[in-house]
A protein has these predicted regions:
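Helix-loop-helix module between adjacent transmembrane segments
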Residues: 15, 74-167, 225-226, 314-322
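Hydrophobic, small-residue-rich membrane helices and short re-entrant helix-turn-helix hairpins
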Residues: 102-111, 171-180, 232-265, 281-292, ...
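Loop-to-transmembrane helix boundary motifs in multi-pass membrane proteins
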Residues: 116-120, 329-365
Length: 444
């Protein structure tokens, strides 16, 4: 435990020094929330990767691969392929809109077409969806801390404090710089863990696909919201505002795709190897699959377990910082419409972190399922983006109907536990968009 605390303290000190250096700059909202649109393509790719590949991966996906087999890896690879396709098709368009109109919050893209009410309601819906998703990161951290004798509540508290201080002081520029360093570290540790599992366990247990868990309908239901993650999740859309030069977007996509492919395969194989270890009698049967990585860390020597714990912390802090900053930018600019005042932005950074802290204490579900539930709610933004870039129909009614009605559908299917909830939500948001478009046409 002492070694872990020392390494954790060193990590916090180094990150805080970077953040404090950045904090000395005079920060406008554009500087604080999107780094003044000056990020290099390498930094953009690594912060995009570190934001995306969070505790969901090394904690959630390892456990999912252990518990459900090959379908877990296919599910994540479908996400990666869809994300790369979305970035290729929409990356430059979104960057151009942000640069031309001075957008800082992703919801600002909707204001001219769908009205300021849609912009504000969209920010509120994103807030409802992303607080649980951010809590996934904090819960993942607390589980890792537990391996070193730190209680769950204490772990949640420590994680929340790190997230708050870095986001509050450094803004996006500080977060992006730490992300770039963390991205390299995460990959190096993942490769080391893969090497260790290959030596520790004999073979892989991947099950088959489809299987009893990964039925075709279940696969579609869980993958559908994830496939559109790059368009529907505001924190990753906002990342496209930060890159300095549109010529770097192609390079950024290639680097991100390469990182994502290697990291996904490694993480999945670790889960498959752990399941083989259970079948061989080396590991016990692990009922709570979110603790698989913790069980593995208990078997590793400190030389590997400590860096692995830190890599999960890195990924979780990165994603949480991004979400907190994006939510703060939306509440500041889209709901309260304060586009010059930096104080309110920092206040919302504190409020968002506090809410994430409180929600994390509940630990409501498995990390992967909680992430998918959040992404399901965010499907409400998909028709709005499609309409913005491809259709001429749709105005205020289309925007409001889709955001409000779609969010209600998503929450209801989550509460009712509908087995095809993502499919119902996907169909529902498009139906609502077209009904709203007809209403707009009638009012015109």
């Amino acid at each position: 435990m002492t070694q872990f605390i020392v390494l954790l303290a060193l990590y916090v000190i180094i990150g805080s020094v970077i953040v404090l250096i950045v904090a000395k700059r005079k920060q406008t909202q554009e500087e604080f929330f999107i780094g003044g649109r000056t990020a290099h393509w390498i930094v953009t790719a690594l912060t995009y990767a570190a934001t995306t590949y969070s505790a969901f991966m090394m904690v959630g996906l390892v456990g999912m691969a252990y518990g459900t087999g090959l379908g877990a890896m296919i599910f994540e690879l479908v996400y990666l392929a869809a994300t790369v396709l979305i970035l290729v098709v929409y990356g430059k368009r979104i960057w151009h809109l942000g640069k031309t109109h001075g957008y800082v919050s992703p919801m600002e893209m909707f204001a001219d077409r769908y009205g300021k009410l849609t912009e504000a309601l969209g920010a509120i819906v994103a807030f409802v969806a992303l607080i649980p998703y951010a809590s996934v990161q904090v819960i993942g951290l607390a589980l890792v801390f537990g391996n070193y004798g730190i209680g769950f509540v204490a772990g949640v508290t420590i994680a929340s404090l790190i997230i708050f201080v870095w986001a509050f002081l450094g803004g996006l520029r500080g977060v992006a710089l730490t992300d770039a360093l963390q991205g390299f570290f995460m990959m190096a540790v993942a490769i080391a863990v893969l090497t260790w599992t290959g030596q520790e366990f004999q073979g892989l247990e991947m099950s088959t696909f489809p299987n009893q868990v990964w039925t075709p309908l279940f696969f579609i239901n869980i993958t559908l919201p994830w496939a559109f993650f790059a368009l529907t999740n505001p924190q990753v859309v906002q990342r496209l505002f930060i890159i300095k030069d549109p010529a770097g977007i192609k390079k950024m996509i290639i680097l991100f795709a390469s990182f994502g492919l290697v990291y996904t395969v490694i993480v999945s194989v670790v889960g498959f190897a752990a399941k083989a270890g259970t079948l061989e009698g080396i590991l016990p049967m692990i009922e709570d699959r979110d603790t698989v990585i913790v069980q593995l860390m208990g078997r590793m020597g400190a030389v590997l377990a400590l860096p692995l714990g830190l890599s999960i912390i890195f990924a979780s802090v990165s994603t949480s910082n991004s979400i907190i900053l994006t939510l703060a930018s939306m509440m500041t600019r889209d709901v309260f419409r304060m586009r010059k005042n930096m104080i309110i932005g920092r206040v919302f950074t504190f409020v968002m972190t506090l809410l994430v802290f409180l929600f994390s204490l509940l630990r409501p579900d498995y990390l992967v399922e909680l992430s998918v539930s959040s992404s399901r709610i965010l499907l409400v933004f998909l028709p709005l983006y499609i309409g913005l870039f491809h259709w001429k129909l749709g105005g205020v009614c289309a925007g409001v109907f889709t955001v409000v009605g779609g969010a209600i559908i998503a929450v209801l299917v989550n509460v009712l536990g509908a087995s095809l909830g993502s499919i119902y939500t996907f169909i529902g948001v498009f139906v609502l968009f077209f009904i709203g478009a007809l209403c707009d046409r009638a009012l015109d």
